[in-house]
């Protein structure tokens, strides 16, 4: 399974490099922001192999991380082992937030990609405001399922 996950991450990295995007955020939601999503919309599970109901994956050219809560620490650790995805345990003091993680890796003017259908308008606005001090933009035109998993 891990070789499949590694291939998927490599395909995403190739796609975002082609689109001049430096990081991509993959949530656990669907276009309706449902708590339980249909298999077609389980992009975070598809890219990471992590089957828990809550988590967010961030992929950059060289780094990948999964943020999830304490219900899933053990499960996530097992499921992402060997994938190159680091586990970030939410709500622990040593765990960087996703914006802090991105700020440590991105340069001024870099673009953070999302599938705009998978985030609320408020989440997109919040991300845009949070990234603005470093000059980063949020791009919302990539559909992971249609453009990467061909």
Positions of PLM-derived features:
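Terminal domain-start leader segments
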Residues: 1-150
